[in-house]
Regions:
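Short glycine-rich, acidic/polar surface loops and turns
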Residues: 192-227
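His/Asp/Glu-rich mid-to-C-terminal helical/loop segments that flank catalytic regions of hydrolases
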Residues: 218-269
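Second-shell loop/turn segments in exported
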Residues: 6-13, 32, 69-78, 151-153, ...
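Glycine/charged-rich beta-loop-alpha catalytic/anionic-binding loops adjacent to active sites
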Residues: 58-70
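A non-catalytic alpha/beta surface segment that caps or lines the substrate-entry region
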Residues: 2-53
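Acidic/histidine-rich catalytic neighborhood of metal-dependent amide-processing enzymes
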Residues: 69-182, 190-200
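Short secondary-structure junctions
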Residues: 28-36, 177-190
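Hydrophobic/aromatic beta-strand patches that form the interior of the parallel beta-sheet core
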Residues: 60-62, 104, 137-139, 207-211
Length: 269
């Protein structure tokens, strides 16, 4: 498709070496991308220049899982988000000033059917907690390649959470709402969705939100009827292919990411 470079086809090939693809892309724009191994999962961590960070402001950790259900293209789930983040990384290294973006491509999200503790991000969040990295804003991007309406996923928080966590989570949700609202002319929605990598962070006491995209008619019908959107029915099948994607979804995702780079939230002790 004209709005995607030819190498996207290479990324969604059934035999693609997705780790090598991501690392080669980032190396090609001048970024190292070491593997962080946690609980047998291989997470990828692009390293941006230190002068693009300022400790006065919150770090914004942006996450997209690169794994996919075996023997499926995974074009929307989640190659679309990964590719948008790779393009974003290229914009970040060329923009002046700070951005405070921490970017991680996670492994093992598709294992979450075995429970949140089996999810790759759970071990990563546990490592964050061990290292004292608990004050980041965490934004998860999942299935961002199809649709015209950005969706903030509704999160059902466990009961009896500390009041400080609930306060921090609500403030993060407010920031997330402003970001997607401004990225699409005020058109956005909030829907109950399957947990993504945000679940692993929440389970470890770190607030995290997740974004996805849906066609407007599917989002509206889901709100009215509770009927599972066609977009979600395509996931984990051969129909999650290049032809299911649309250009506007990538344009909206790009604006969301740029808004995140512009966001400044003062870091409190």
């Amino acid at each position: 498709m004209a709005f995607l470079e030819e190498d996207f086809n290479d990324f969604i090939r059934l035999d693609a070496d997705r780790i090598a693809f991501i690392q080669n892309y980032l190396n090609g724009i001048g970024l190292d991308c070491p593997i962080i191994q946690v609980d047998g999962k291989n997470h990828l961590y692009p390293v941006f220049p230190k002068n693009q960070y300022n400790a006065l402001f919150k770090i914004k950790t942006i996450i997209a899982h690169y794994d996919r259900v075996p023997n499926t293209p995974g074009a929307n789930d989640n190659s679309s988000s990964v590719y948008s983040l790779l393009r974003f990384a290229e914009r970040l290294i060329n923009r002046p000033g700070i951005h405070n973006i921490r970017m991680i491509f996670t492994d093992g999200e598709e294992l979450s059917e075995g429970g949140v503790a089996s999810q790759g991000a759970f071990g990563l969040a546990k490592l964050f907690k061990k290292l004292g990295i608990t004050k980041d804003d965490v934004y998860v991007f999942d299935c961002m390649g199809r649709g015209t309406i950005p969706v903030l996923t509704e999160s059902l928080l466990p009961k009896n959470l500390p009041s400080l966590f609930v306060k921090d989570f609500c403030q993060l949700e407010e920031r997330a709402e402003k970001i997607i609202r401004s990225a699409n002319g005020g058109k956005w929605t909030k829907l109950p969705c399957n947990y993504s990598d945000n679940a692993g962070f929440i389970a470890n006491g770190i607030p995290a939100v997740a974004f996805t995209m849906l066609p407007s008619d599917e989002a509206d019908y889901f709100l009215r009827s509770g009927q599972r959107p066609l977009t979600w029915e395509k996931l984990h099948t051969m129909e999650d292919n290049l032809q299911s994607l649309n250009e506007e979804a990538f344009e909206i995702t790009s604006r969301i990411l740029d808004n995140l780079a512009d966001l400044r939230t003062v870091q409190h002790a």
